[in-house]
């Protein structure tokens, strides 16, 4: 058993263009200047856990630093704080519970410098929409509620009521069609 913060940890983390630069203390060595093309403190912790798993798999020797750097530089996580457009910046995140929404909010607050944040939100009916909105409320200026074509999608009218109870009705808009909601967000 290895424990984060005891046998391994993220020693340093700096925001970098397109991700973050890490130094990770593994079980067998310290790995520095690791570029991770993902955003968020939680992604750095995930990277450290992955590194330690690979170290454990290969036994009692340090990993080749060049292989570690190349491996992490090639990492992708589609739909997780993924920058899909610039000017205006559009970030796609598939947070589907309050914990994921908190990680998104922390990342947006600490790693980006936006003057205004407009969130386009659609939620499945079996998810904690109130909890998701409560985590986003401190950092989001306006919310556009929508729904996907999935049969599991919460109707946008229901989501509108929930969002309005958290944000206030003056900060929430309903656009039931997802593509139209995205168009509205980038036009505003």
Where are these regions (language model features)?
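Short, acidic/turn-prone active-site loops that include or flank metal/cofactor-
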Residues: 6-8, 122, 147-152
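General small-molecule cofactor/ligand-binding pocket signal
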Residues: 1-4, 82, 91, 173-175
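C-terminal helical cap/extension that packs against the catalytic core
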Residues: 17-22, 89-92, 98, 133-188
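Short, surface-exposed acidic
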Residues: 2-4, 63-68, 171-172
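Nucleotide phosphate-binding/pyrophosphate-handling subdomain across enzymes
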Residues: 20-142
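Residues that form or immediately flank small-molecule/cofactor binding pockets and catalytic motifs
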Residues: 6-8, 77, 86, 177-179
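Extended acidic/charged loop-beta regions that coordinate divalent cations
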Residues: 1-31
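Short beta-strands and strand-loop turn motifs
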Residues: 4, 114, 144-147
